[in-house]
């Protein structure tokens, strides 16, 4: 799995999301208006969705490609379909 992802990119994205979540927590403590908190929650959600997109793209470009070329194509496609289904629920 490591070879199909840009680990540094993913770690940096996750650190940013972590910072966003901590900022949301501080906003709640500071009694910031609800609308502003919702905006930040949406930003964190969007960032997580993008991380999922990056992971799914890496999975397709490496794991799925390798599974089709060197493994069981039917199982690989079925597993990828499940991954896409999970991603679509984000």
Language-model regions, residue ranges each:
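Solvent-exposed interaction patches of small proteins and small membrane subunits
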Residues: 1-90
